[in-house]
Amino acid sequence: MVYKTLFALCILTAGWRVQSLPTSAPLSVSLPTNIMPPTTIWTSSPQNTDADTASPSNGTHNNSVLPVTASAPTSLLPKNISVESREEEITSPGSNWEGTNTDPSPPGFSSTSGGVHLTTTLEEHSLGTPEAGVAATLSQSAAEPPTLISPQAPASSPSSLSTSPPEVFSVSVTTNHSSTVTSTQPTGAPTAPESPTEESSSDHTPTSHATAEPVPQEKTPPTTVSGKVMCELIDMETTTTFPRVIMQEVEHALSSGSIAAITVTVIAVVLLVFGVAAYLKIRHSSYGRLLDDHDYGSWGNYNNPLYDDS
């Protein structure tokens, strides 16, 4: 029982490790996930194990059901789950990468005999919170069980944070004497296009099937407000510069001599006007009315020198 439990935990850990293997052409698939700790139930048959199935749902199971609780980190922040493979080839979903016994296996998982088919699936929850459902199908011979090596780094360690929308992607791992990643198909939100730069010793040519969709960007149409603002600014600048130019021109045009000449001219004009008015008044003035005494009273008109009283 203990052996089966450890075996199941090792397979689960190896599945998580395969997702975080480094590749020559790094393909980072961003998933903002809030992963709740799922309850994983392993269903196995005695001796010749045809299929070990792990699913987060509560299904029917026989007497050899081992409830294993896989503790997953609960996080409120989006996590970036990157799928990487070191010195391995990314091919189409239908092709298999075949290596020899001398080829190094990826760290964290090695098998001695039999073909191991490991399928890791991440599905998006209907509420927007993706849940990790791991379905591992293992076929092996009962004589030589595969030797599993614990991963060097914890598989639950999140990499860099990302803000890209959630997506559904599946990673199918088929191992024949050595574990390799054969297909990576991200679907949903667009990811960075893959560009594998290094090739392994195999004869296959790496092909990439990742579809990159352009992200729609909102472009604001040009408005006429900017033109109005520019016109207003130009008007303000012109209105503020014109008086300054005029004042500068006046300051350069009017010197002290010109100011004195203007002042003297104004004073002369004023004196001339008052002089002409005084001359005309003096010339047309009279010494009084040339009337009789009875018109002015008994005292007579003594103010008029032409008046003759006798």
From Swiss-Prot:
Modified residues (Phosphoserine): S298
Record topological domains on the Cytoplasmic side: 280-310
Membrane-topology descriptor: Single-pass type I membrane protein
Domain of life: Eukaryota
Glycosylation positions in this chain: N58, N62, N80, N176
Membrane-spanning residues: 259-279
Stretch forming the signal peptide: 1-20
GO cellular component terms, semicolon-separated: cytosol; early endosome; endosome membrane; Golgi apparatus; Golgi membrane; late endosome; nucleoplasm; plasma membrane
Function of the protein: May regulate TLP1 expression and telomerase activity, thus enabling certain prostatic cells to resist apoptosis.
Protein name (database record): Prostate androgen-regulated mucin-like protein 1 homolog
Organism listed in the record: Pongo abelii (Sumatran orangutan)
